[in-house]
Structures are given as C-alpha cells and as structure tokens.
Amino acid sequence: NETSASIPRHEDEFVRAGLTPAASRLVSAPRVAESPVNFECRLSQCIQLTTAEGLAVDTWLVLGEVVAVHIDESLLEDGIYQTARAQPILRAGGPSAYYAIDESLRFDLVRPDAR
C-alpha cells in the first residue's frame, strides 16, 4: 500500500515500497519486477476533472495506450490469462476496502449471439 502515498516528487517510490525496477522494452518508465503482470503505456491524455458546474478540481484522469504487455508464463493456460491463479487484489471502494479473487468465485456467462 506504500505506493498509494502522496510523496514528494523527488522521492523514489521503488525504494519507499521495497520494490525492484525492471527496464521496459518500449517506454522509458520502469516496470515493477515483482509484479507478474506489467503493462507498458504511452500517455494519450491527461484530463483535469471538474464539478458539475464546470469548476476544476485537483483530480486528474490519466489515459494511456498499452504498447506492450508482460505476463509471467505460469499465469497462462493455452495462451489464456488465468485470473484466479494470479490472486489479484482489487480496490473495493472506501478508504480501506479490498477484495481478493480466487477460483471459488469463478462462473461462466456465455454471451448471446449478436443479432
């Protein structure tokens, strides 16, 4: 959770969180070596959000284009990413609520044919 802290611009988040930077192939920003899945992205847009009245707030929406994906091969089965195997943790809302995904939560939902 250390990487969610607001820290001074010059402070190294990798050092603070005890994580290892890994070189990316297509972008200059490093990846997190300990993460089994990494996306390399290029900035598309930075949009300052506003109130309903159009007043700017101190919150930004950052959109990027994924230009490379790195996935630990142990998380792939027949080329398909196995979400539960990765045991991801998801933000659930509020200041401290999270969920963990495991295989017991899986269900199949077949999409209807497009008409």
Set out the residue ranges of the language-model regions.
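Basic, polyanion-binding surface patches
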Residues: 1-115
